[in-house]
Design a protein with these regions (language model features):
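Conserved alpha/beta catalytic core and glycan-binding cleft of carbohydrate-active enzymes
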Residues: 160, 173-176, 181-235
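Substrate-binding/active-site clefts of carbohydrate-active enzymes
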Residues: 2-160, 165-191, 210-211
Length: 235
């Protein structure tokens, strides 16, 4: 019980054996990047246990670690791999926990707000929010793009994960606020010798105009399909 909800628990022998008996070949984890509790939840004494509120793109969330050490995550991945089970991460690069213009200044806002986020052209105090979370990371800017690419390579090369599911992936394609041929981020992925070999899964929409992009992602990408999902629900 003391390991419940931790990386060590997922990598312990009884859990791995159970997954193998089920015939599981891949596990996809909800976001494990270091994240922040939403203010409105904290004020009610609640916690964000989904993780879609990223703070640090290179740090495993410590509340999921029994030991508090990065090695625990790597050991979990190694143990699952030894059982023939791949590990895919759900990643949230479309926004951060800094929220809208009233949110806390914790990372990119304090470094270079107008470079790392898509700011409103008419009033740069405000953000163009294509994510519904207060801000949108600006992958059209080379520094923001490099940050995300470096993070992905770190998790693939150092932490040895097998792939990524990209939350609100259309937001990663926005250039000048529009989804234009899925943007330079996807070109960068395709040209990267590490990332073009891992599994890539898109949630192919965001909340902005033109964001619904099911069927339009590049070769090598898998996509969630909400219409197929809804069709299955009808049976």
């Amino acid at each position: 019980p003391e390991l419940r909800g931790t990386y060590a628990a997922l990598g312990c022998a009884p859990v791995v054996d159970y997954l193998r008996r089920l015939g599981v070949t891949t596990v996809e984890l909800l976001p494990v990047h270091s994240f922040l509790n939403d203010r409105h939840l904290a004020e009610k004494g609640l916690q964000n246990y989904w993780g879609y509120n990223s703070l640090g793109y290179f740090a495993p969330e410590t509340r999921y670690s029994a030991s508090g050490k990065v090695k625990e995550f790597k050991t979990m991945v190694k143990t699952l791999h030894s059982a023939g089970i791949e590990v895919i991460l759900d990643v949230v690069y479309n926004h951060t926990c800094e929220g809208n213009q009233l949110g806390p200044t914790l990372s990119m806002r304090g470094v270079d707000n107008a470079s790392y986020y898509i700011v409103n052209a008419d009033n740069r105090r405000y953000y163009d929010d294509f994510t519904g979370c207060g801000n949108t990371v600006n992958l059209e800017h080379p520094h923001a793009l490099q940050l995300v690419m470096d993070s992905l390579r770190y998790w693939a090369e150092e932490m040895h994960v097998d792939g990524f599911r990209f939350d609100l992936a259309s937001a990663l394609a926005r250039e000048s606020g529009k989804v234009e041929n899925l943007g330079g981020f996807f070109d960068a992925i395709g040209q990267d010798p590490t990332l073009n070999r891992v599994k890539l899964i898109a949630e192919p929409w965001d909340l902005g105009h033109g964001g619904y992009q099911v069927g339009n992602f590049p070769p090598g990408w898998a996509e969630w399909n909400d219409r197929y999902r809804d069709g299955l629900r009808g049976f």
